[in-house]
Amino acid sequence: MLGALFIAMLTAITVWWLLIQRLKDKPWTKQGVLPTSQDTVTSSAPKVGLWVFLAVVSSLFGLFASAYMMRVGGHGGLVPWQALDEPNVLWINTLVLVLASGAMQIARNRIDADDFTGGRSYFLAAGLLTVVFLAGQAFAWQQARAGGNVGPGSPAYAFFVLLTAVHGLHLIGGLWVLGRTTARIFRGVEANNVVARSRIRLSVELCTTYWHWLLLVWLGVFALLLST
């Protein structure tokens, strides 16, 4: 039951966020020019690709959540389920990821306002905070293993590592894109090229959407872990 609710929550949040971003996306109000049909197609293709990707990965996390709840209920395993004491550092990690998502949003707002220098600083801050979050997650694995109430081979510990690792891998992939976008920002600020800056805005928008989505997924995963 909780697994189905988790799937429904992720789907609803994803759809809501995408609709909000779609309504807020008014490229004709930027720079005082109307977009051409080619510009619209060029900017829409990456957004559609990201939305499809988010929907697919949301389903993946939903399946993991369903498997988790089935295993908690005693299905499909010989080893009895023993709850894991969640490491306290997860609360700090959650706050760090919230700050990273907030920094990413500020970076987008600054860059949309043509403040590329200020936006660049917040964009880099978001990346650094994300690295801190990943380091904190690795430390959480060590804390969970040394907790004493479950062994490293227990189902609870295995699911804990699985859920946090899959989420972390998606963040690492996002950091790769963030690095490329940061390089574009530096080049765009120096070149002062209209086309380059337009592409930077699109890249930052996609990164911001992705970071917000990963924050929402982590909140769902964390709530799932705490509930059991």
Summary of predicted features, one role per range:
Residues 1-228:
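...captures the hydrophobic TM-helix bundle architecture rather than a specific catalytic motif
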